[in-house]
Amino acid sequence: REVQDLLGFIKLDLLVVKDLEVIRLALESIKSNYGIEINIENIPLDDRQVFQMIQDGHTTGLFQFDGSAVPKRILIDSGADRIADLSATNALDRPGALNMGADKEFVERKLHPEKTTYMTPYAEPYLRETYGTVCYQEQLSQLSQDKHIIGFDAGQADTLRKVTAHKDKKKIEKMVALAKETARSNNVPENIYNWFCDLAVEFGKYAFNHSHSLAYAVIAYRGGFLKAHFPEAFLSALCQIKPMMKGKDKTT
């Protein structure tokens, strides 16, 4: 990976997402059997029936939410009712985040917003969406660029994002040292920049990309929309594309 980076090569992960095929097949079935043509890209993203189904734990067949029991627990316990909650759940379902108790913090703060706190008011714009819990690489990068927290320029912030994403301990330590130096030059209080640096070290254990997580959430939601409103078409498509799902969860 380091050699590829030095040579300027772009790394592309090309993965097969069978859930997209499930959605396509379900849409074809709905059109054929009910005469209803759905533009899946234009469905409402706040459908109450979809989120009620998710809150009830009926996530079988929903992308990223039908395997481990962890995301289902987070969705149920938090009463997920926004795409942003689905996205955060994806990011929190990582060993490092779970070991740090970030999932429990997220659930508690979503249920009781008054318990949401910020180390500094300047952190709120970047963490408000996730109730003060850091979930994404982008949040760490944004925090680092605020002159009241660290004051990195865009290039330094992106380097920090990369080293945490790659979980490179030595490079993370180097960036933390630079962060402290930069913060001091910006007259940032010691407790603020130490908080951020501790966060960067811990975050390097589980950093997750927001755009990645959000894309996952949208796929899950679209599947959930079809499952909630056209269960026969969705489950039929699911069994055809993912035959191993048959009988997996009788509660669906």
Regions found by a protein language model. Give the residues of each.
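Noncatalytic, beta-rich nucleic-acid-contacting surfaces in large DNA/RNA-processing enzymes
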Residues: 1-252
